[in-house]
């Protein structure tokens, strides 16, 4: 019987599948770390900038954690197939701040900040949900549990930060721009997540020699999730509410104890 638990256990138990999974995750975290680091330097707001820097530091830490998990098994990073590069595929669709913009030493505008926060609000929702699922599966695992719990907590902090900052901007009259940006970002994200999920499963299927029936069942599941999200599930990524964790990224990052 197919389940998320059995699927991720199969990935964990195979060195090459685990290597691909962690390499994809590490690359995404590294890109997020670079982006947030650049944004922190370009944000004119002296209160917001250190929070963005903390966000970037967390993403860099996550990248190191995924690499450390590979190294513990004697594995090295591998090249990530282009069709699994979630971050860059979103950027090519004009979602988030383009890397070319971030490489210019020009202060970000208020609309740039809205674009950044809306992009983060949507993608951190996805990351928070994914890490919660992994925490349920591997939270007590002797090898993975500590890492999964740490990353999951960080992703929840990032999501809380996005809610709080977007609500602050909405209070100052940017509500319509925020809503429009969130909706456009969410619609693009659900398509990208579907396509990247199909690509990742195809690459894993080759490594794990899945029979056609299993690959077809997994693909059908991915398409079913997309159908639900397209029908209205995407709206969960666009709502804003004051988080229980206020000032979640205030202060320096906690001392890193894993990688």
Regions found by a protein language model. Give the residues of each.
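Non-heme di-metal
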Residues: 1-259
């Amino acid at each position: 019987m197919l389940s998320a638990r059995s699927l991720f256990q199969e990935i964990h138990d195979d060195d090459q599948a685990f290597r691909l999974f962690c390499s994809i995750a590490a690359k995404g975290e590294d890109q997020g770390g670079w982006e947030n680091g650049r944004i922190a330097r370009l944000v004119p707001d002296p209160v917001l900038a250190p929070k963005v820097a903390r966000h970037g530091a967390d993403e860099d830490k996550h990248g190191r954690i995924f690499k450390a998990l590979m190294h513990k098994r004697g594995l090295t990073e591998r090249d990530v197939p282009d069709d699994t590069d979630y971050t860059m595929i979103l950027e090519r669709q004009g979602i988030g701040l383009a890397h070319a913009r971030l490489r210019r030493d020009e202060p970000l505008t208020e609309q740039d900040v809205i674009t950044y926060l809306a992009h983060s609000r949507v993608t951190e929702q996805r990351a928070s949900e994914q890490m919660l699922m992994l925490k349920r599966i591997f939270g007590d695992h002797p090898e993975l549990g500590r890492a999964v719990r740490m990353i999951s907590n960080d992703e929840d902090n990032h999501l809380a930060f996005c809610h709080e900052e977007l609500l602050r901007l909405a209070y100052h009259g940017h509500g319509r721009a925020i809503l429009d940006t969130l909706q456009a970002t969410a619609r693009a994200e659900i398509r990208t997540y579907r396509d990247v999920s199909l690509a990742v499963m195809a690459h894993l299927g080759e490594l794990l020699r899945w029979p056609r029936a299993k690959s077809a069942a997994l693909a059908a599941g991915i398409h079913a999730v997309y159908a639900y999200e397209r029908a209205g599930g995407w709206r969960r990524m666009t709502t804003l509410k004051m988080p229980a964790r206020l000032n979640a990224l205030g202060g320096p990052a906690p001392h890193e104890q894993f990688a």
